[in-house]
Amino acid sequence: MKEEDIRIREAIRKRLIQCRTDNNLTQTDVGRVIGKSKNAVASWEQGLSLPDIVTLYHLSIYYEKSLEFMMGEEE
């Protein structure tokens, strides 16, 4: 895996955790909002997998953040 891919994957993982905890949500809560399981959300946050782009887009809308923010490209 390329270094840039690893950086983006880690940024997404951290942003997902940050957005969820900043909003006082559980992984179950997030899963319900986007129609995914708690296990899927946990897998993303552990860096085992990534949400697809459509799911990441829906999360960015829910959290009122840009896709660039979710990918670690802006503060």
Segments (PLM) and residue ranges:
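DNA major-groove recognition helix of helix-turn-helix/homeodomain DNA-binding modules
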Residues: V54-F69
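Short alpha-helical DNA-recognition segment
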Residues: N23-S43
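The alpha-helix within a helix-turn-helix
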Residues: R20, G31, S60
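Residue-level detection of the helix-turn-helix DNA-binding "recognition helix"
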Residues: T21, G35, Q46-L48, E75
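Short amphipathic recognition helices of helix-turn-helix/homeodomain-type DNA-binding modules
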Residues: F69-E75
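A short, Lys/Arg-rich alpha-helix, primarily the initiator
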Residues: M1-D22
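The DNA-contacting recognition helix of HTH DNA-binding domains
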Residues: Q27, K38, L48-S49, L67
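Residues within the helices of the helix-turn-helix
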Residues: I17, T28, Y57
